[in-house]
Amino acid sequence: MKASLLNKLDVLQDRFEELTALLGDGEVISDQAKFRAYSKEYAEVEPIVATYKHLTKVQADLEGAQALLKDSDPDMREMAVEEVREAKEKLAELEGDLQRMLLPKDPNDGRNVFLEIRAGTGGDEAAIFSGDLFRMYSRYAERRGWRVEILSENEGEHGGYKEVIARVEGDNVYGKLKFESGAHRVQRVPATESQGRIHTSACTVAVLPEPDEQEAIEINPADLRVDTYRSSGAGGQHVNKTDSAIRITHLPSGIVVECQEERSQHKNRARAMSWLSAKLNDQQTSAAANAIASERKLLVGSGDRSERIRTYNFAQGRVTDHRVNLTLYSLDEILAGGVDAVIEPLLAEYQADQLAAIGE
């Protein structure tokens, strides 16, 4: 393991001991803000320190086993050979774990998100598939205890959505959904197809982290056009509806956002402004992210909206993620909310890219 990583681990171990003492201090315990902050840091540092302690113990075991390789007793030497092999395997595993634990954290991972799903090529079938994708993410959210609120929707003529925008709130939402942005393709026989021919349609998904108030982009009110309108429609589980809605146009960029979630215009405006800030921030950061991804020849993590990332083939019950050459024959389970089957391999690939960058 690199000396720089070992130095960082030593610093974290000292900090862990300091945090342990602080959390037992009466003055800290009486200050709830400090206590929460230190408790959060303790929870982040503790597993790293525990793994580091395990690594140092295995290193000591390895040194002891290597010393026994010189023993005069052939049985002891034979046993030592096996112990050395096991210790080296364990060391490699623990070093890999620690490297992953020390990877830079995405500051947006813990944020809520704005989820945008739009029908692309394929007409009515694309709109129906947009509805399928929204249900998939809603069911995934239910499994994780997240809350989904529709902000804006434009229903398709034969079901689904031409466009649906939702806010997803919960723990580590962006960290889980950030690689869902891109073009999702479906191959199936539409219900309206009398000849039984397979059609190909597509939808685009965008996942934008919700900025907090301190980090929200400052927007000049003179750059905005605000329209109000009345909205109605059928709601579903975890979805709030309203009679009043707001549409905000950011004139310099042409970005339009609308919200019909809350019953008060004031709340709708606040939510729409937060969404607008997220879109403007995404506009600024996506170009830089694409440049980095292109330079390092990455697909996972580029966030390119035009990139075809996944195909859902109903005839074969197959889901293929093209970025990591992942093919799963569990379409029904994934559409029922089992999206982790695709998300976890993507996160693993992203971490591998980060580790490779550290080694460059």
Swiss-Prot record:
Assigned keywords, A-Z: Cytoplasm, Methylation, Protein biosynthesis
Modification N5-methylglutamine, positions: 237
Gene name of the encoded protein: prfA
Protein name: Peptide chain release factor 1
Superkingdom of origin: Bacteria
Function noted in UniProt: Peptide chain release factor 1 directs the termination of translation in response to the peptide chain termination codons UAG and UAA.
Post-translational events: Methylated by PrmC. Methylation increases the termination efficiency of RF1.
Localisation: Cytoplasm
Family: Belongs to the prokaryotic/mitochondrial release factor family.
A GO term, aspect molecular function: translation release factor activity, codon specific
Main location: cytoplasm
GO CC terms in record: cytoplasm
Cross-referenced HAMAP family: Rel_fac_1
InterPro entries, A to Z: PCRF, Pep_chain_release_fac_I, Pep_chain_release_fac_I_sf, Prokaryotic/Mito_RF, RF-1
